[in-house]
């Protein structure tokens, strides 16, 4: 799998949150390689208080919706466990459509029972740790004027359940703050670890009730 080698903040390339409406590509941004994002990502740190206070084992699985064009539309399957319901796994399913003119940026539209919820999402940084394990920084924000959904967040995700080590995490945070964007800096200041456990069970699959978001954990 092709990756950046990111061993210090000097080698971590960051972009501030893009403007999703009529956005212009940041010329310094290096897009992720084709198909790089597909598979499972473990969210190890997040600025979203709702998540780090109430949930654990947060995983996002990305797969392509085949249309023969790159960048293509993707399906996104989120799974998590509430801290107060340790035996349950809740899911949320959505379709991610690429944003015209922007690399690594999408409109995420939930389906079924959550079809009233949409977000803009983008990668702000990506690379690999000293063990050559890929990581990525995810930014998500509600659409302008949205009255439901969680507020904007920044999160660190890794291919490994327990993510980058503390040194790497601090380097990522410093690089994000060095971008000089006040919104991003505020979110980074609120980054907290998200509990991940060493589980042996398989991941949820996109069965009908999952795609329809029949059994989703939501406070809305």
Swiss-Prot record:
<keyword id="KW-0843">Virulence</keyword>
<comment type="pathway">
    <text>Polyketide biosynthesis.</text>
</comment>
<comment type="function">
    <text>Part of the gene cluster B that mediates the biosynthesis of botcinic acid and its botcinin derivatives, acetate-derived polyketides that contribute to virulence when combined with the sesquiterpene botrydial. Botcinic acid and its derivatives have been shown to induce chlorosis and necrosis during host plant infection, but also have antifungal activities. Two polyketide synthases, BOA6 and BOA9, are involved in the biosynthesis of botcinins.</text>
</comment>
<protein>
    <recommendedName>
        <fullName>Botcinic acid biosynthesis cluster B protein 12</fullName>
    </recommendedName>
</protein>
